[in-house]
Amino acid sequence: MRVLLVALALLALAASATSTHTSGGCGCQPPPPVHLPPPVHLPPPVHLPPPVHLPPPVHLPPPVHLPPPVHVPPPVHLPPPPCHYPTQPPRPQPHPQPHPCPCQQPHPSPCQLQGTCGVGSTPILGQCVEFLRHQCSPTATPYCSPQCQSLRQQCCQQLRQVEPQHRYQAIFGLVLQSILQQQPQSGQVAGLLAAQIAQQLTAMCGLQQPTPCPYAAAGGVPH
């Protein structure tokens, strides 16, 4: 019991000593309380849209500089080339007999109009008639056409089938008949023109040329 009392006394002394030491210090006052500012209310975060991905820039090619236009001169229309046709060499004729000159008659006879004067059984020169009908004579303009060239070859083949002594008379009669059918005119003018064309046709086919009229050089007509 006495020990308990001693312990309580010691505790009381220790407590009093501790309170005296605490209250009787340097006499400093405690610092005033610190006033903190009120809290700042931040705005809510702004949700930005996602970034837009733009396409890469298109690089245009540099402009093309065209050359200035070239002024082309108008085409020059050249005249058609002259007609060249092969001439066949004349065949040797077995002593041709002289034939009467058709231009000695101022007016054509009926046999000359029919193209059968002195021919007898000579075949009709149908291709030569077509040759003259298409105005394919050597003095006409469309003489160089392919149709005229074909008719010319066929006409020359038919002329070679005629006997030499009757060949010129046959072609003269055909030419004279064709002239009078196309352009009616006087018999003397038609006869001279037919003689000229007949000579050109025989030369064109490479055949023997007829003998000229004895009065043609003097320019007269026998009576």
Curated annotation (Swiss-Prot):
Region described as 2 X 8 AA tandem repeats of Q-P-H-P-C-P-C-Q: 97-112
Entry keyword Membrane: yes
Principal location listed in the UniProt entry: membrane
GO cellular component: aleurone grain membrane; vacuole
Subcellular location: Vacuole, Aleurone grain membrane
SUPFAM superfamilies, A to Z: Bifunctional inhibitor/lipid-transfer protein/seed storage 2S albumin
Sequence repeats: 31-36, 37-42, 43-48, 49-54, 55-60, 61-66, 67-72, 73-78, 97-104, 105-112
GO MF annotations in UniProt: nutrient reservoir activity
Signal peptide: 1-19
Protein name: Glutelin-2
Species whose genome carries this gene: Zea mays
